[in-house]
Amino acid sequence: SSSNVYVVADIELGADNRIWVGTRQNYLQTATDKGGGRIMYSDNGTTFTVAYSHTNQAGRVKVACAPSSAYTLYAVFEANGKVDTLIRTHNKGKTWISVSKPKDADTGIPGTDPSRGQAWYDLSLAVSPLDTTVVMAGFVDVFQTQNKGLAWLQVGKWSNNSGLANLSCAYVHADIHTFTFKPGSTECLIGTDGGIFYAPDVMDNMTNQAVIYEANNGFTVTQMYWGDISQTKGKDLMLAGAQDNGTNQLATSGLCNENMISGGDGGYCFISQTNDNKQIVSYVYNQFYSTTNNWTANAKIIDDATTGKFINPAVWDDLNGYLFTGKSKVTIYRNKLGTSATLATTVTVNGTAANGAPSAFCSSISSAGKTQLYVGTDVGKLYVTTDAVASAPTWKDITGSTGSAIPAGNISCIHRLRLSDTLFVTISNYGSTANILMSVDAGVSHCAEEVQLGTLGLNWLTGQ
């Protein structure tokens, strides 16, 4: 928390029990040098010495110690989200030697950055327990060197897209986070966004597609961003938007029976309350797809990869047929199922960017049959309109007044009880003065409702 300390990105233990640390930038530091790009070590856990300082003040650093030699280490540096530099030492950090960067065969991945701008996320190294010249490196894909980084071989591919289709190596899910060797062995587990992969021997012919296996049978660890369930009584039908594992449809009971509707990152998804064949799924930002025949055919209902949040909040009023999604700090998108994405309408919610971008929605049908829409923002503002499909909806700020207002923070959920003016709002920020708020007068005033939850950030609640 202090502005004069280094921030740790990685801690490793050398073969002689020396502690090695890779740093990242300390954003509490006001100076130009924020402490990133350092390799440090300690023999007592109290005093640390800088063994290497990146000249360009890089950010995140990952360190790999050779299990068979206390003298050999490798390190990789991130700068501005990209893979910047790889280095090695064979004298415990007294001198360092530059190592070449792997080049991914994927034509969509820059030749100078195998992380594709995600080195803040997918960055990993490991040295073989039996040979200090053999190193595994993970970014979007998996690489191996058997000569200290003089040359790299791509031994895993996430797809068969352009450039990868003709590459002879095993499928390994994108975004590599860790390698774990069995002590004294060349057996290796690989941790990815798609779970665990197993290499019985990393010294095997790694261009053989059969030498790395997916090892996720019964291992259900996929992170879900969003989901929906059929309202048809007794029917097994769900949609689930997963982190880097697509949007999946589950139409039979039990796990591992899913059908992937769309790939990449799945997000908000919906099943019609009255017709199971009508569904909506999403990819990142404002890329939403719809179907009216259970994915026999589909079309984009909103098509904008430049606006909205990465996992973009949305709500579908399928009784009136309209989808609403976050667009910018003052606007939302609106379009009707079955309508071309080119006809999506931009609707202004509030006139000042300081009031934040949409972060949560809630829709209900008024007694007049119109779409009543609530929009929460990422700075704690709450708005409502009684006719969201009007050509120019009229919005009311119902954040509340001093003493009974929603606190500043990210509104993560809005829930209105059926046939009631009772409204609940959750705030996802840790340390917020109130993280569950209730209004019994449709938003005129709000009061804190959590009991014994402290300052936990909350993402969701539901009720009748």
Residues covered by each model-derived region:
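Beta-propeller blade termini and top-face loops
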Residues: 1-464
